[in-house]
Amino acid sequence: MSGRGKGAKAKGKAKSRSSRAGLQFPVGRVHRFLRKGNYANRVGAGAPVYLAAVLEYLAAEILELAGNAARDNKKTRIIPRHLQLAIRNDEELNKLLGGVTIAQGGVLPNIQAVLLPKKTGSKSSK
């Protein structure tokens, strides 16, 4: 007798909660951080899955835009400058990360309109 009861089946291979949810970010680690961080006495089973999905989405969004910024600068490696350009040129990300300073990020190029040279009028026809 195997000791599993009548209709119980063998467990099989362990499957992580991240792979069950189709995520790359670690659901188990996020759950541990939620428990250890004293955010609440109890943490539901769905909360770390949802939070890991949100974090993964934000990371993918920022990396996508930073990759585009790197390609625009003819570079193959993303540096902090590319992250800065990606975040500051995106309205929603800039609002979310408005108070964040990115080390070695630099500033956005910006010239006030009044400082630009005056445009010459079109040539008058005779």
UniProtKB/Swiss-Prot annotation:
Q: PTM per UniProt?
A: Monoubiquitination of Lys-119 gives a specific tag for epigenetic transcriptional repression. Phosphorylation of Ser-2 directly represses transcription.
Positions of modified residues (N5-methylglutamine): 104
Comp. bias intervals (Basic residues): 1-18
List the InterPro entries.
Histone-fold (IPR009072), Histone_H2A (IPR002119), Histone_H2A/H2B/H3 (IPR007125), Histone_H2A_C (IPR032454), Histone_H2A_CS (IPR032458)
Q: Would you say which domain of life the source belongs to?
A: Eukaryota
The record describes the protein's role as: Core component of nucleosome. Nucleosomes wrap and compact DNA into chromatin, limiting DNA accessibility to the cellular machineries which require DNA as a template. Histones thereby play a central role in transcription regulation, DNA repair, DNA replication and chromosomal stability. DNA accessibility is regulated via a complex set of post-translational modifications of histones, also called histone code, and nucleosome remodeling.
Stretches for region Disordered: 1-21
Q: What is this protein called?
A: Late histone H2A.3, gonadal
What species is this protein from?
Psammechinus miliaris (Green sea urchin)
Cellular component terms per the entry's GO annotation: nucleosome; nucleus
User: Which classification does the entry list for the species?
Assistant: Eukaryota, Metazoa, Echinodermata, Eleutherozoa, Echinozoa
Q: For this UniProt entry, what is the primary localization, expressed as one broad class?
A: nucleus
Residue list for modification Phosphoserine: 2
- For the cross-link Glycyl lysine isopeptide (Lys-Gly) (interchain with G-Cter in ubiquitin), the position is 119
Similarity-based family: Belongs to the histone H2A family.
Q: Where in the cell is it found?
A: Nucleus; Chromosome
Molecular functions per Gene Ontology: DNA binding; protein heterodimerization activity; structural constituent of chromatin
Give all N-acetylserine modified positions: 2
Per UniProt, which keywords does this protein have? Acetylation, Chromosome, DNA-binding, Isopeptide bond, Methylation, Nucleosome core, Nucleus, Phosphoprotein, Ubl conjugation
Q: Which Pfam families match?
A: Histone (PF00125), Histone_H2A_C (PF16211)
**Ranges annotated as spanning the membrane:** none
| Assembly with partners or alone | The nucleosome is a histone octamer containing two molecules each of H2A, H2B, H3 and H4 assembled in one H3-H4 heterotetramer and two H2A-H2B heterodimers. The octamer wraps approximately 147 bp of DNA.
